[in-house]
Amino acid sequence: MIQIRELLNETSPNNFTPEHLCALHEQVFSKVYPWAGKFRKVDIAKGDTLFLKHQQIASELKILFSNLANANFLKNTTPTEFSEAIGNFIIHLNLIHPFREGNGRIQRLLVWQIAKNAGLTLDWQSV
């Protein structure tokens, strides 16, 4: 399993897509889960939260990442604007919950990359 720290040190991509999200998941979890990097094929819930039906994952991620691209991947935003926009992005991505396991770790890694690409630094300690 590749260490997330190693990925944090890599250059962030300029383009974020559902395929990039899958690639991150596969890089991190390929030695743990045989389905790493692939969208879940079952419906799941955590507590009282029912996540998006698995048949809708690909289409909803396409919309979510298209909206991010239309916002120029949040480049040239103030820290406040970035926080609000990325907060909404995380809410939607979490409700989609594309993978059976590892969603939170991959979300944080992706958000860190988006922030880095936008010229910002995240401090997860203060979140």
Language-model-detected regions and their locations in the chain:
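FIC/Doc superfamily catalytic core
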Residues: M1-V127
